[in-house]
Structure formats: C-alpha cells, structure tokens
From Swiss-Prot:
Single GO molecular function: structural constituent of ribosome
Gene3D superfamilies noted in UniProt: Glucose-6-phosphate isomerase like protein, domain 1, Helix hairpin bin
InterPro entries xrefs: Ribosomal_uS2, Ribosomal_uS2_bac/mit/plastid, Ribosomal_uS2_CS, Ribosomal_uS2_flav_dom_sf
Organism: Chloroflexus aurantiacus (strain ATCC 29366 / DSM 635 / J-10-fl)
GO annotations of cellular component type: cytosolic small ribosomal subunit
Any single GO BP term: translation
NCBIfam families listed in its UniProt record: rpsB_bact
Protein name: Small ribosomal subunit protein uS2
Family of this protein: Belongs to the universal ribosomal protein uS2 family.
Pfam families according to UniProt: Ribosomal_S2
Keywords: Ribonucleoprotein, Ribosomal protein
Amino acid sequence: MTQALPRVVTIRELLEAGAHFGHPTNRWNPKMKPYIFTARNGIHIIDLQKTVTGLSRAYQFITELTARGEKVLFVGTKKQAQEAVMEEAVRSGQFYINQRWLGGTLTNFATIKRRLKLLSDLEEQRDRGDFARLTKAEAAKLEEKIVRLNRVFAGLKGMDRLPGAVFIIDPRKEELAVREAVKEGIPIVAMVDTNCDPDPIDYVIPCNDDAIRGIRLMAGKIADAAIEGTRRREMSQE
C-alpha cells in the first residue's frame, strides 16, 4: 500500500505568497507545460495543485532523508533568496550557500573540506587567544582571512561529507549547482518557475521563484521537513 503524501501547504497559502505567478509567456520553457494552469495578461499562471503535490513529495523525501542522518544543502544566491535560505537552513540544522556558488563545491569536495578545516583551525586559534602572541599586523591579516573564508564557507561549517540532497531556489540561476549535483548523483529538490528546465530536478516544486514570500514559504516547509526527520531519528535512537 502506497503511503499517503503529507499535505503541508494550502492553496490559500500559495496564493497569498504569490506562488502562482510565472514569467511572461514569451519567456517560458515548454518543458514546464504540464505545470502551467493558464495564461493571464501575458503571464503564465502555475497550476497550484501541482505545487501542493510537488511540495508534499519533496517534504516526504526530505523527512525520510534526514531521518537517516543525511543533511540538506540549501542553495539560493539571488538577493531575494539569501536571507530565507540562511535563516531556514540554520533553523533546521542544515547547510547553506547564499552568496556565491564556488565551482567544485560538490565535484571537488576534498578541496572544500581543506578550506573548511583551515577556517575551523583559524577560528579555534583566535578563540584560544593565540592571536595575542602575534604582531598587530599578523593578527589583522589572519582576522581578514577568517572574514574572507566565512564569506564563502559560513554556511558549510561542519559539513564533512557531501549532502544527501540539495534544495535549490531557481535552478536556472544556480545552473552550476544543478550540474554538480547531477554529476555526483545527489538528488535535487527545487522551486522551478515557468522559465526553468525541470528535467534535471528530482523533486519539482512548480512555483514563482522570485517572490520573497514564496521563497520563504517553500524554504520554511523544507526546513520543517528536515526538523521532523531529525526528530524521528533522535526518537528512534532513544
């Protein structure tokens, strides 16, 4: 017997978040046709029933994934996504990239791990007071290095292996992240607007990926799923 999908969002919530507004009809990807309800005033309107189903499938997947002890990497570097991506990843104890995708983050993870270790070691030395034994210029140089590394790697601290999944806001913008995840066989959950190619995405959530409220709603639901999965794992280990 197939397990019923969790119903985690209502049509009303989606409407209030503006999730149904796609891109102008002349800027669409024909592969998104199954997810489009109609066109109004030259704008594609997303079929929100498909959004409900897509989010439910993604929620179930993320819950099961985190219940196995896997982690999710939230990715959203466009301005309107940065805050929600960071806050929801932190709230749910997951990882995030919200500034710039560094090429090789997934496909050259050994190098990324070395950079993360360097950042961790420098912060440890600073917190231990080791910098006090250096000249002012040397200490300032290392502080600047910490700031620089944090700018890129703050959301990846503690990530010692590849994530079990990536959650992407706007796969068109995050094309490199999509390519790397596909290459590494990492499942992709994504908010997919009418101008995107849904083919590389394992869990398509058809949705306006430009509206801040819509982004926050979706990131929040994926974070809730991760929290639920983590809670299940903790309960099973008691």
